[in-house]
């Protein structure tokens, strides 16, 4: 019981990172700690953005921090929750079949979409923010309980700064740069 309690506390940790969040309106930071398992280009995103995007998929192992952070400053303009299955998070179909929660963030220059996806162990997607709430870059807004994956959709003209296999840290690692006009 003691070991289980220690792991439970370890798993639900949310380290403070406010002092070292990368500055700049053009930078998009990782929404989660984990490993980049896919970077796709020209993905048609119809849920919120309605355009071709880059999709960055981040797998969260049971050893990663499972709190999710806002990739950029903005306001939550879209929010949805979908019940679903609990397939392993590394399967390609999880984004369509598993339980998931999505938020669309309207930024000063462009919009992005973040989807939290539950997995075989992760049975709950939790959001602490509501539609209309403002978010600062790196601010905590949700959690996937017991690991899974996070998908980040960013505009197609943005520069991608990560590749498959990279380790990222939520609120710290720059995953993309917007082209500001």
Q: Can you say where each PLM-predicted feature lies in the sequence?
A:
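Contiguous, well-folded functional domains in the mature portion of proteins
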Residues: 1-181
